[in-house]
């Protein structure tokens, strides 16, 4: 199993956990990490929020095997990763608790598991959809009556894609993972 982290917070507890982990990881970031950064990384344009970063990983870094996709404002234990590595579904949204899953509508881009079979199909179908707007590198604005909901467009399109897959794919699942804690915009 491989890990793909996206973000630019470079959360120190997560870095320490991944340095000690047996699971290989790639950090997809939109700015260069600190000079002493001990992990493999790929930097690219800041477009598409997490789905843009996940697509960059899928198109340029992923070779084969299942992957855990995570925001970098996350804490996760090796026991949690071991449990995730035993998953037999093709795709699952990962949550710390049932209450966390309910609060997020049972879907989010902060943490998910994807099988090799699923990622192969997704890559064949063109990869993760993401909105390039606004594509000027500026922070994505808050949703208002005059500004589109950039923050939720990716997950809405992703869920529609999951629902379009043949029944042979076990997707759109929820997994409760003790030892996982996801943050929000750099805050845990």
Could you tell me what each predicted segment is?
Residues 1-188:
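ER/Golgi luminal nucleotide-sugar-dependent glycosyltransferases, focusing on the catalytic module
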């Amino acid at each position: 199993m491989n890990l793909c982290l996206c973000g630019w917070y470079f959360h120190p507890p997560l870095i320490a956990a991944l340095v000690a982990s047996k699971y290989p990881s790639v950090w997809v970031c939109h700015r260069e990490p600190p000079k002493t950064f001990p992990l493999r990384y790929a930097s690219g344009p800041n477009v598409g929020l997490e789905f843009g970063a996940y697509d960059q990983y899928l198109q340029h870094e992923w070779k084969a095997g299942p992957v855990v996709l995570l925001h970098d404002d996350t804490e996760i234990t090796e026991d949690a990763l071991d449990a995730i590595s035993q998953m037999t579904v093709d795709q699952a949204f990962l949550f710390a608790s049932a209450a966390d899953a309910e609060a997020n509508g049972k879907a989010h881009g902060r943490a998910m598991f994807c099988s090799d079979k699923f990622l192969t199909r997704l890559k064949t179908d063109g990869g993760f959809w993401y909105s390039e707007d606004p594509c000027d590198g500026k922070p994505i604005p808050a949703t208002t009556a005059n500004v589109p909901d950039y923050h939720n467009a990716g997950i809405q399109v992703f869920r529609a894609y999951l629902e379009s897959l043949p029944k042979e794919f076990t997707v759109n699942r929820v997994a409760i993972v003790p030892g996982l804690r996801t943050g929000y915009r750099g805050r845990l």
